[in-house]
Amino acid sequence: MGTHRIFIGLIALCCFCLPHLIEAKPFGVYQQQVFVDQSGHGNFTTIQKAIDSVPINNRHWFFINVKAGLYREKIKIPYEKPFIVLVGAGKRLTRVEWDDHYSVAQSPTFSTLADNTVVKSITFANSYNFPSKGKMNKNPRTPAVAALIGGDKSAFYSVGFAGIQDTLWDFDGRHYFHRCTIQGAVDFIFGTGQSIYQSCVIQVLGGQLEPGLAGYITAQGRTNPYDANGFIFINCLVYGTGMAFLGRPWRGYSRVIFYNSNLTDVVVPEGWDAWNFVGHENQLVFAEHGCFGSGANIGRRVKWVKKLSESAIQNLADLSFINRGGWVEDLPIPA
């Protein structure tokens, strides 16, 4: 994830991100339900056409059910189409794939700038650098985003995110990821989102990197000590091939917490890297609490890793970190 490329991407996105003004209607109220089926037995044959059918400034939950299959398309939910619920047949059965690359702003296979987006049981993949049938991809490694999440109050249940570099751009807003699988090798969870990752599987694909090169799981972009954002990983599994740091700072007050998570030996002993902020490590909030596994030995961590108080940890590793107003409980979670 090149900093200059990210900056360019942010400028491009700002042209589309208008203030979030629409609030959710009561739980259970929905306007319409449509089906996407490539065989022609649904309302639409592509996911994007189904999204396009949602009314501008929609104010009720709109369910889009996607049948099993490989969907070769780029998908975008614009900011003016909130309250979309996108449901697949399973993250191994419904897969959306594209191979755009280089620009983080233009490459996402899936992007949502709308508030109140809910996705369940789908995988979004950027295939540009992704290994095929276990074989190493020989394309030059470059940013290739699988998903960009830019709206507030958005949740993802049993969703897959597959890529190598910059897989999941957790761009902005409050987000909840539950039982998701995120695959990558370099900065593959990055951005300035205020997010909880609960019971997720983080798979390091270090075998796609040059021999001896360690990857990076997170690159979080908190810019000052008063920013509320950060990435909180709760009861997650970190495993894979090769080696990886838990994170490095994209901005000077980066905040990432791993809580009660299983860290295997894919995690490098040092745990964290200061990257471009050597000498300013005291500003970074990189912490682990209650983690276990062969990669969780904090005795070999960098000396500047944060030692947070029990009360600070409990405040961060709690749904209330993202759930002001109780929006998570009000989501129309598909069965």
Swiss-Prot record:
Glycan-linked positions: N43, N262
Catalytic site: D166, D187
Expression (tissue specificity): Expressed in flower buds.
Coiled-coil regions, chain positions: none
Biological-process GO terms, alphabetical: cell wall modification; pectin catabolic process
Subcellular location(s) of the protein: Secreted, Cell wall
Keywords: Aspartyl esterase, Cell wall, Cell wall biogenesis/degradation, Glycoprotein, Hydrolase, Secreted, Signal
Highest taxon listed in the record's lineage: Eukaryota
GO annotations of cellular component type: extracellular region
Signal peptide residues on this chain, from the entry's feature table: 1-24
EC number: 3.1.1.11
Catalytic activity: [(1->4)-alpha-D-galacturonosyl methyl ester](n) + n H2O = [(1->4)-alpha-D-galacturonosyl](n) + n methanol + n H(+)
Annotated function: Acts in the modification of cell walls via demethylesterification of cell wall pectin.
Family: Belongs to the pectinesterase family.
Protein's recorded name: Probable pectinesterase 29
